[in-house]
């Protein structure tokens, strides 16, 4: 439905400024709403009154973000939601105040006017389906837990370095393993290691199926003389490390649960019944999940991130939007005889990270990707730039496969 009403919403943490224009661009009304359930109910009632009970699909809302609770609420209410880049909004604002004056009311008016004058410059947002939304949120939970785990491990290493450096040098990179936490419970200091028997350490190694370490090696290093720090300092650090290990064990358990849920969800997407080509003469059309999973270099986390963060773009088979969203499309700055091609910085950081790992692994396992990567490196391209070029090709192939509904065919050299 064609837009008849234009709303600018300058969002904030506790309050949002709203400005309403009609079909001719005339300023109708403005107000503030609170960031609460009742606040959005008031917004719906107010817009209905001001627009003479117009349908929500005929009302467009422009704001300077493409995600978050405000966007989710507006999409759920049925409004057309348009996102504008903050840099674009700054240029629109300069039309009204070259001096740079800025306030919430002016920003809301600028957003509404931008949607009225140049709707093609804004991006229409679509609500992701429940599967893509679940993948996105679960993958973000995994990333957050992974960062928490790394932070706890760094704190433990710092405390160990302060009074028990032998333990840190032996297990510093493996602190998240249950085996290391079991060793700490029995040998939190050199004195406890002196009392520990070789047989008990071997039993612990066998119980956790650890072969990289030997009991003699562990006991020899942990029984070494400790740093000459005060007894009280050592005791308090030991208590702190014990608490950190307990937190680390909990985070590790939660991380495994989230990863299992992520794998289960991806598996369910693969087993969903296709909606086309279900006749007996034609094979069933593979799902988007199966098509992307067949690509070289795509693992569980890359697949979940692609479907979760770019699910709408993938559903629309929009290659140009996907390469911009993933930071693959370069930025060209040309003026006169000067022409510079730069890396795109305005992109989804999670997709940028996934593209890097996708291209990196594909360059290792796929002969075509490896050949392309080596050719670019020979021409003097940096590692990152070569990988972005490989990722660009992979995205083009993936979009073509999604349109055709075919799986990636590996060469004989790969198999």
How should these model regions be labeled?
Residues 1-415:
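A detector of single, family-specific signature residues
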């Amino acid at each position: 439905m064609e837009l008849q009403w234009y709303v600018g919403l300058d969002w904030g943490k506790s309050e949002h400024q709203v400005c309403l224009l009609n079909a001719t661009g005339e300023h109708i009304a403005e107000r503030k709403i609170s960031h609460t359930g009742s606040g959005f109910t008031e917004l719906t009632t107010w817009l209905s009154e001001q627009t003479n009970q117009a349908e929500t699909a005929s009302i467009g809302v422009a704001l300077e973000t493409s995600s978050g609770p405000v966007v989710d609420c507006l999409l759920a209410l049925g409004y057309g939601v348009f996102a504008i880049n903050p840099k674009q909004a700054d240029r629109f604002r300069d039309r009204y105040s070259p001096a740079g004056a800025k306030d919430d009311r002016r920003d809301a008016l600028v957003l509404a006017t931008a949607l009225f004058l140049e709707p093609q410059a804004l991006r229409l947002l679509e609500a992701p389906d429940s599967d893509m939304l679940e993948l996105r949120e679960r993958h973000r939970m995994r990333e957050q837990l992974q960062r928490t785990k790394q932070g706890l491990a760094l704190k433990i290493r710092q405390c160990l370095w302060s009074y028990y450096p032998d333990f840190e040098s032996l297990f510093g990179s493996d602190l998240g393993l249950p085996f290391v936490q079991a060793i700490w419970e029995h040998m939190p200091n050199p004195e406890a290691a002196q009392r520990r028997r070789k047989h008990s350490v071997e039993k612990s190694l066998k119980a956790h199926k650890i072969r990289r370490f030997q009991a003699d090696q562990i006991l020899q290093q942990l029984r070494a003389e400790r740093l000459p720090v005060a007894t009280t300092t050592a005791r308090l650090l030991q208590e702190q490390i014990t608490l950190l290990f307990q937190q680390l064990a909990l985070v590790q358990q939660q991380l495994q649960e989230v990863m299992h849920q992520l794998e289960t969800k991806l598996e369910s997407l693969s087993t969903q019944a296709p909606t086309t080509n279900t006749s007996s003469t034609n094979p069933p059309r593979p799902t988007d999940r199966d098509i992307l999973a067949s690509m070289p270099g795509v693992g569980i986390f890359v697949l979940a991130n692609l479907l979760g963060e770019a699910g709408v773009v993938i559903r629309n088979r929009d290659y140009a939007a996907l390469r911009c969203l993933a930071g693959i499309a370069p930025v060209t700055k040309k003026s006169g005889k000067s022409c510079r091609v730069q890396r795109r910085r305005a992109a989804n950081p999670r997709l940028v990270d996934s593209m890097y790992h996708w291209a990196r692994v594909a360059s290792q396992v796929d002969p075509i990707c490896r050949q392309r990567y080596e050719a670019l490196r020979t021409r003097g391209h940096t590692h990152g730039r070569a990988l972005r070029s490989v990722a660009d090709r992979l995205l083009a192939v993936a979009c073509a496969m999604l349109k055709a509904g075919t799986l990636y065919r590996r060469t004989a050299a790969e198999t």
